[in-house]
C-alpha cells in the first residue's frame, strides 16, 4: 500500500501540471471501489478551477475554487496518472477526469481498494480527517508529544508508529526502515523507550521519509507517480524485504517476524534494544 513518500511523490508530480486547469467532465466507469462512489462526484467539481494539490497522511487532495476538494486514497494498487488526449481506456480505469488542456486524469485500480471522495474543503480537518494524528515533518512531533503517546502503551513500538492516530503516513515499509536506522527492536514496548531512543526514532523517521521522497517512493509492484514513473527507494531498503540477507550495517542476517499479520524485518544485532 502506498505510504506517505509515495503520495507526496504523486502530489509533487501532479501539482504544477494541474493548478489552473478545469475539470470539464467526470466519467465513472465503475462506481464500486472500496466504497461506492457518489454520483455527486460528477457534478460537485465540474467546471471548476484547480487551486491546489496537496497531501494529508496517505491521502491526495485536490482543492477547487468552489470550496470543494477531491480526496484520493490509492488503496493497495491504485494509480492516478496524467494521460494524453488520445489515451485509450484500460481495463481497470474506474474514473476519468477530462481536463481543460485536453489531457485526462485517470484513476486506475486493479484490486479496487482505492477511494475517491468530494468534500467541502473547510470541513476536511474537522470531519474527514478528524481521527488523524500529526504529520511526521510537523513541529508538533516532539519528544514530549511522542513520549505522552507511548507512556501507557504496552504494545510493540512498530505498531505504535504505524497508528495513524499517533503519526500519519508510516506503513510497513517505512516503520521497519525507521526502526532499523534508530537501532530499536520492533518488538520493544512503546512505554519502555528511553528519551534518547524516542528522539532518535523521530529523527530516523524523518530521515527515512526524506530519502524515500527524494527517490520517488518505493515501487514493489504497482506504485507509479502522476507521470507513470516508478519509485526507486527500493534500491535503498536496508531491511524491508531482505529476510535471510546480510545486514548492510553489520553483516548479521535480516530476520522476518509478524506483527498483527504484517511482515516486520529487522537486524538482531543492530536492533538489540
Curated annotation (Swiss-Prot):
Q: Which reaction does it catalyse?
A: Hydrolysis of DNA containing ring-opened 7-methylguanine residues, releasing 2,6-diamino-4-hydroxy-5-(N-methyl)formamidopyrimidine; 2'-deoxyribonucleotide-(2'-deoxyribose 5'-phosphate)-2'-deoxyribonucleotide-DNA = a 3'-end 2'-deoxyribonucleotide-(2,3-dehydro-2,3-deoxyribose 5'-phosphate)-DNA + a 5'-end 5'-phospho-2'-deoxyribonucleoside-DNA + H(+)
Name residues in a coiled coil.
Answer: none
Report which superkingdom the organism of origin falls in.
Bacteria
According to its UniProt entry, the protein's GO biological process terms are: base-excision repair
**InterPro entries annotated for this entry?**
DNA_glyclase/AP_lyase_DNA-bd, DNA_glyclase_Znf_dom_DNA_BS, Formamido-pyr_DNA_Glyclase, FPG_cat, MutM-like_N-ter, Ribosomal_uS13-like_H2TH, Znf_DNA_glyclase/AP_lyase, Znf_FPG/IleRS
**Cofactor(s), by name:** Zn(2+)
Question: Which residues are involved in binding DNA?
Answer: 92, 111, 153
Q: Which GO terms describe its molecular function?
A: 8-oxo-7,8-dihydroguanine DNA N-glycosylase activity; class I DNA-(apurinic or apyrimidinic site) endonuclease activity; damaged DNA binding; zinc ion binding
The record's family statement is: Belongs to the FPG family.
What's this chain's function?
A: Involved in base excision repair of DNA damaged by oxidation or by mutagenic agents. Acts as a DNA glycosylase that recognizes and removes damaged bases. Has a preference for oxidized purines, such as 7,8-dihydro-8-oxoguanine (8-oxoG). Has AP (apurinic/apyrimidinic) lyase activity and introduces nicks in the DNA strand. Cleaves the DNA backbone by beta-delta elimination to generate a single-strand break at the site of the removed base with both 3'- and 5'-phosphates.
Can you say what this protein is called? Formamidopyrimidine-DNA glycosylase
* Organism the protein comes from: Rickettsia africae (strain ESF-5)
Amino acid at each position: 500500500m502506498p505510504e506517505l513518500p509515495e503520495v507526496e511523490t504523486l502530489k509533487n508530480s501532479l501539482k504544477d501540471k494541474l493548478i489552473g486547469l478545469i475539470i470539464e467532465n467526470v466519467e465513472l466507469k465503475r462506481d464500486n471501489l472500496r466504497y461506492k462512489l457518489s454520483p455527486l462526484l460528477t457534478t460537485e467539481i465540474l467546471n471548476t478551477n484547480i487551486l491546489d494539490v496537496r497531501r494529508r497522511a496517505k491521502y491526495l487532495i485536490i482543492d477547487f475554487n468552489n470550496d470543494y476538494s477531491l480526496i484520493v486514497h490509492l488503496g493497495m494498487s491504485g494509480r492516478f496518472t496524467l494521460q494524453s488526449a488520445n489515451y485509450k481506456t484500460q481495463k481497470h480505469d474506474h474514473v476519468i477526469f477530462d481536463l481543460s488542456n485536453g489531457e485526462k486524469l485517470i484513476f486506475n485500480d486493479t484490486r479496487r481498494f482505492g477511494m475517491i471522495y468530494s468534500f467541502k474543503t473547510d470541513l476536511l480537518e474537522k470531519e474527514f480527517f478528524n481521527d488523524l494524528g500529526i504529520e511526521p515533518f510537523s513541529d508538533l512531533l516532539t519528544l514530549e508529544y511522542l513520549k505522552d503517546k507511548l507512556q501507557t502503551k504496552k504494545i510493540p513500538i512498530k505498531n505504535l508508529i504505524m497508528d495513524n492516530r499517533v503519526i500519519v503516513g508510516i506503513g510497513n515499509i517505512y516503520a521497519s526502515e525507521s526502526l532499523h536506522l534508530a537501532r530499536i527492536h520492533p518488538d520493544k514496548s512503546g512505554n519502555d523507550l528511553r528519551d534518547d531512543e524516542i528522539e532518535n526514532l523521530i529523527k530516523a523517521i524523518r530521515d527515512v521519509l526524506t530519502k524515500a521522497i527524494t527517490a520517488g517512493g518505493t515501487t514493489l509492484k504497482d506504485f507509479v507517480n502522476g507521470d507513470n514513473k516508478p519509485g526507486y527507494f527500493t534500491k535503498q531498503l536496508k531491511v524491508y524485504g531482505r529476510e535471510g540477507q546480510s545486514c548492510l550495517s553489520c553483516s548479521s542476517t535480516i530476520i522476518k517476524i509478524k506483527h498483527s499479520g504484517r511482515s516486520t524485518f529487522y537486524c538482531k544485532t543492530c536492533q538489540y534494544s
